[in-house]
């Protein structure tokens, strides 16, 4: 950037706002790329798979956040990308912190299928029998919120008539699924 700026002549009276803007953009890009894992957000998708006749629940977290949470909450440290025990521990952690209930308050209990790391993301998979899909009335998801109170867990419930998005913050207990 400095070489580019040195080679340009500035017209008399012209400001250096353009150069300042470029430098600000460069610094912003660097700061975003170095702290991307600190977004403290997770995404969960719940949808019915008619072929398998299962409700598929897929949670996406930043792998670095998962490692940090395991170290802080459970005292378990290591590389989640190479240690299957850490991956399994985080899957169990998410399963404990995610809940579904029906309109009467009865728990629907998703089965933990597994977890995997792909790139920067850690994926946790759960499933329910298809018959439970229409019964989902409330969703709870407070994963990582005891580590980061500002953690936002977004849940997309995909149905035939569209997607319902719930955003759980501040250790929301259970949020009602909108009609």
Predicted regions, residues:
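N-terminal secretory signal peptides that target proteins for export/translocation
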Residues: 1-15
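Serine/proline-rich low-complexity intrinsically disordered segments, especially terminal tails, linkers
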Residues: 17, 31-35, 155
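Bacterial N-terminal signal peptides
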Residues: 20-31
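N-terminal soluble domains immediately following signal/targeting peptides that reside
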Residues: 36-179
């Amino acid at each position: 950037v400095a070489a580019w700026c040195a080679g340009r002549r500035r017209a008399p009276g012209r400001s250096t706002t353009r150069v300042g803007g470029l430098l600000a953009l460069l610094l912003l890009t660097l700061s975003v790329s170095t702290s991307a894992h600190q977004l403290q957000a997770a995404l969960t998708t719940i949808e019915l798979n008619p072929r398998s006749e299962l409700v598929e629940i897929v949670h996406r977290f930043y792998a670095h956040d998962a490692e940090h949470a395991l170290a802080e909450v459970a005292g378990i440290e290591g590389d989640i990308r190479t240690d299957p025990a850490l991956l399994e521990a985080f899957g169990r952690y998410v399963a404990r912190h995610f809940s579904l209930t029906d309109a009467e308050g009865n728990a629907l209990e998703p089965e933990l299928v597994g977890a995997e790391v792909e790139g920067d993301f850690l994926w946790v998979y759960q499933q329910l029998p298809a018959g439970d899909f229409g019964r989902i009335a409330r969703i709870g998801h407070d994963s990582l919120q005891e580590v980061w109170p500002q953690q936002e867990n977004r849940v997309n419930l995909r149905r035939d008539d569209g997607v319902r998005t719930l955003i759980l913050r501040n250790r929301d207990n259970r949020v009602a699924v909108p009609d």
